[in-house]
């Protein structure tokens, strides 16, 4: 059996590697020639534990080949689509998915299995199956099969979670779901649940919308904590001792490819407006601006004009331990303050193009803003770092610092007690 994986990003490349490691012949396809060149050299274009070692192994065995040529996909029995589905405003942009479906239609044979892993609005898999029927003259469930198997992994833990997380597979036809289950069972040790395609689409979107709404509630608690002079993290810890309470963690914002986008995908085909989900999005989207307000307040307390201030932002990724900056609240924060301050410096140990070291980025700075919860930031001696700063201000957007360092003006999201 030959598997083609279309889209070699944060999900597509690890997925291709997993199937190749399971003994399948895999061809990975991406329209970005520079990505293909890098992968062929044995180096992944994304940061993920173990990915380079695993990539080199399957390349050396000849189980994975990558290409930007559509004709190289011919002869594949399975097509797994892992392309992005971004937003255009608040509406889904399915152009990448439709382009991938048209590519599959050019090369697929009878009996092919087409799996969409991309996160999509409810009803999209059915629409793509109809598009394939129109393009090929074949019938889903008879001549080819279409299923939705949404990814459910976290950057930094992708390979482990691909194996051990449970999997939801929805088929346009029952046979499509069964064929996809058999395929994923080659490496998935978690449970696999079968359903129809639209239910599978909704499950993935519900999961991320649940998280987004609950983070918004935690962020609203953090905003209230400032008004009441309370440490929201202490309050949350105590509230969570109740057996039926599990409050999420607030912070500078919600990022990544999924959480800021998926609530809008869930609502995109709805026939009426659902206010709670949209309000939660607005709360999470305002958090970078709230963090900027904390910074300007601290600068004022230190008698520093924003136009004369040098700001060192620690972390650009949307979460700790990854280089993924998609929809990162750190980037939104930088955008908000950039035109109001003298200079914005950035340092992220995982993201290329930032300062070389923490020590260099803070030298002569007036304020530090912690925007990402990288593990490297949790063991920093802030008093020592402060010796090279012009002024000592820290804004903690990720609750990295439990006790404000001596000699600093300290502000933190949800830290109404300081």
Swiss-Prot record:
Enzyme nomenclature, EC number: 1.1.1.336
Gene3D superfamilies, sorted: NAD(P)-binding Rossmann-like Domain
Stretch forming the signal peptide: none
GO MF terms held by the record: NAD binding; oxidoreductase activity, acting on the CH-CH group of donors, NAD or NADP as acceptor; UDP-N-acetyl-D-mannosamine dehydrogenase activity
Gene Ontology biological process terms, A to Z: polysaccharide biosynthetic process
Disulfide bonds: none
Catalytic reaction annotation: UDP-N-acetyl-alpha-D-mannosamine + 2 NAD(+) + H2O = UDP-N-acetyl-alpha-D-mannosaminouronate + 2 NADH + 3 H(+)
Active site: 204 (proton donor/acceptor), 258 (nucleophile)
Tagged with keyword RNA-binding: no
Domain comment as written in the entry: The protomer folds into three distinct domains: an N-terminal nucleotide binding domain, a central helical domain involved in dimerization and a C-terminal substrate binding domain.
Amino acids binding UDP-N-acetyl-alpha-D-mannosaminouronate: 152-153, 204, 208, 211, 242, 244, 249, 255, 318-319, 398
Protein name per UniProt: UDP-N-acetyl-D-mannosamine dehydrogenase
Positions contributing to NAD(+) binding: 10-11, 30, 85, 119, 261, 326
Role according to the record: Catalyzes the four-electron oxidation of UDP-N-acetyl-D-mannosamine (UDP-ManNAc), reducing NAD(+) and releasing UDP-N-acetylmannosaminuronic acid (UDP-ManNAcA).
Family named by the database record: Belongs to the UDP-glucose/GDP-mannose dehydrogenase family.
Organism this protein belongs to: Pyrococcus horikoshii (strain ATCC 700860 / DSM 12428 / JCM 9974 / NBRC 100139 / OT-3)
UniProt keyword list: NAD, Oxidoreductase
Assembly: Homodimer.
């Amino acid at each position: 059996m030959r598997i083609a994986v279309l889209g070699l990003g944060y999900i597509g490349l690890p997925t291709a590697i997993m199937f190749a490691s399971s003994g399948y012949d895999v061809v990975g396809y991406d329209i970005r020639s520079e990505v293909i060149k890098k992968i062929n050299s044995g180096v992944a274009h994304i940061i993920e534990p173990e990915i380079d070692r695993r990539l080199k192994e399957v390349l050396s065995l000849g189980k994975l080949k990558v290409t930007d040529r559509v004709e190289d996909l011919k002869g594949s029995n399975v097509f797994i689509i892992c392309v992005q589905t971004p937003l255009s405003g608040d509406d889904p942009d399915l152009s990448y998915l439709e382009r991938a479906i048209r590519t599959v239609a050019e090369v697929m044979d009878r009996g092919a299995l087409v799996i969409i892993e991309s996160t999509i609005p409810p009803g999209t898999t059915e629409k793509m199956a109809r598009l394939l029927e129109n393009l090929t003259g074949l019938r889903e469930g008879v001549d080819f099969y279409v299923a939705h198997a949404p990814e459910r992994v976290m950057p930094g833990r992708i390979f482990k979670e691909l194996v051990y997380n449970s999997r939801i597979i929805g088929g346009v036809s029952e046979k499509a779901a069964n064929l996809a289950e058999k395929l994923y069972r080659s490496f998935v040790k978690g449970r696999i649940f079968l359903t129809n395609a639209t239910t599978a689409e909704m499950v993935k979107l519900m999961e991320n919308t649940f998280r987004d709404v609950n983070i918004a509630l935690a962020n609203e608690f953090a905003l209230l904590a400032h008004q009441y002079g309370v440490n929201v993290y202490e309050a949350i810890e105590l509230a969570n001792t109740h057996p039926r309470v599990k409050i999420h963690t607030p912070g500078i914002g919600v990022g990544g490819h999924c959480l800021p986008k998926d609530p809008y995908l869930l609502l995109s085909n709805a026939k009426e407006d659902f206010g709670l989900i949209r309000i939660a999005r607005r709360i999470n989207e305002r958090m970078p601006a709230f963090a900027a307000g904390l910074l300007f307040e601290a600068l004022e307390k230190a008698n520093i004009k924003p136009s004369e201030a040098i700001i060192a932002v620690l972390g650009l990724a949307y979460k700790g331990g990854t280089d993924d900056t998609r929809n990162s609240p750190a980037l939104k924060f930088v955008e908000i303050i950039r035109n109001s301050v003298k200079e914005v410096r950035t340092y992220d140990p995982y993201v290329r193009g930032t300062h070389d070291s923490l020590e260099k980025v803070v030298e002569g700075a007036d304020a530090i803003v912690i925007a990402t919860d990288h593990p490297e930031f949790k063991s920093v001696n802030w008093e020592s770092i402060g010796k090279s700063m012009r002024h000592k201000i820290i804004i903690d957007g990720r609750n990295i610092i439990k006790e404000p360092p001596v000699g600093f003006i300290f502000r933190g999201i949800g830290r109404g007690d300081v």
